[in-house]
Structures are given as C-alpha cells and as structure tokens.
Amino acid sequence: MNNDRSTRKKLVALTFDDGPNTTTTNEVLDVLEKHGVVASFFLVGNNINSESAISVKRAYDLGCEINNHSRSHGYMDKMTAGEIKAEYGFVDEKVFEITGEHTKFFRPPYIAVGGLMWENISVPFISGLGCGDWDDNVTVERRVDVITEGVRDGSVILLHDAEGNRKTVEAVDKIIPALKEQGYKFVTVSGLFKAKGIAPVTKMIYSNALQKGMWG
C-alpha cells in the first residue's frame, strides 16, 4: 500500500461531458481559471470543429485533460465491434490532432455498457457523481447540494458543458469554493489516479479512484 502523503490528500476530479463548443465550454474554463483549478473534458466528436477546437486547445493549455465521450453520443452497447472502434477512434484522432496526446479515458454515453465495448475500447471507463445537470429543470442550488453533499475523497464529479447549460456554469462557480472549504484539491482524472497510487485498469467503470468493484 502506498502511504505517501499525497495519497492522503482529499482529491476530486471535475469532469465535463458533451462539449466542445465556443460558449459554455469557454464559460466553464473562465470559472476554472478564476478559481485556479483544472478539470477533465470528455468530448463528443461530432461537436469538434475548427472553432470549438480552439476551446479544446485552451482547456489543454490550462492543464486540463481531454478525454473521449464517443463521436455521436449513441447507445454504444447496441453497436457492432466496428462501430464501437470507429466511435472511439474518431474522437481519439481529433484530440491527438489538437493536443498531440491520445485520450486516456472513455465515458460511455448514457453510462450504457455492453460486452463488445469492453473488448474494443482499450482504456478505462469513467462514470462519476452526477446531479442530473443535463436537465434544465434541475436548479443551480440542487446541482450544488447534490455534488457538495455526495462527494468523497477520490470522487469523479460528472457534469455537462453542453451548449447553453448556464446553470452548470453557475453551479461550478459555487461548487469549487465549497469543496475547497471542505479541504478538497482539484486534479485531472489521470492526476487523481496517480496521486492515489492506483493504476486504473480496463473492464472497469470508475466513479471513484478508490472504488473496489467494477461499478464502484
């Protein structure tokens, strides 16, 4: 067991799905910069274009991690092996073109996982502590409360930077200082596993770096 002091720090990883775009993604980045923290972005390939790629590069240059959320955001548990590889590979290639790095983690759309996905995507899968923030009916206050009350050391926080999701931008601006007050530090998903001395494995879907079972 790794008893290094860094493994005993309270750490969380903010993550954002469904970008990139030139509006909400940049608003989230503004909040991250304001508070001096990093996050990880799980991109939908069909949203990557010459303009939104600038937001991706900005995130990367700020120290954020860029990961994979499929090309089309379809139900990949119902896809063939070839379709699954194409969904993952498209985003991985686009991210490499922008950042010079391959994606290290995959978040399955709808957290829907089937056997062929395990066999055809060779990186660890990531879920996370969510608050239903894809639903505009969920208030800013509810988003903040669910995250700040549910978070634990090692948590991956699952949020969305889809275009127009202003309530999550407002919520993140409150979540970050609230968790700092609780003693949490913010890292990327890769940084979370590294700091905890854990090597993430495939055929697992992590919502917390410290979980023991396949689903946490």
List each language-model region with its residue ranges.
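Active-site beta->alpha N-cap acidic-glycine motif
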Residues: M1-D77, E83-I84, F90, K94, ...
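A generic signature of intrinsically disordered, low-complexity regions enriched in glycine/proline
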Residues: R8, N21-T22, N137, N165, ...
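Catalytic domains of cell-wall/extracellular-matrix polysaccharide-remodeling enzymes
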Residues: E27, S50, R58-D61, R71-K185, ...
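C-terminal accessory extensions appended to soluble enzyme cores
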Residues: A199-G216
